[in-house]
Amino acid sequence: MKISKGKYKMKIWNSGKSTAYNVDFKVPEECKGMVLKQKVPYEFLETGKSFEEIVLVYYGTPDKFKVTTTWSNKEGHEYSKEQIVSI
């Protein structure tokens, strides 16, 4: 989602059936300066809810990159999901 010239938002949401805890994400080393991690770890994310982080786009920014989202359930079991984000 574009919010201004060179500035986008990446949305992280819970499409599961239960609350996710300690939600965080990782990006490749070469993309770390692009994605601002201002809200993570997100303490809990209820079903159907989301939050956004700012993505800075500049000359030389990759058209797409991998994001690995991590979270745990109420019992503390950890989960992760890899996705491709395209700009």
What are these regions (language model features)?
Residues 1-87:
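Amphipathic alpha-helical "stem/stalk" segments
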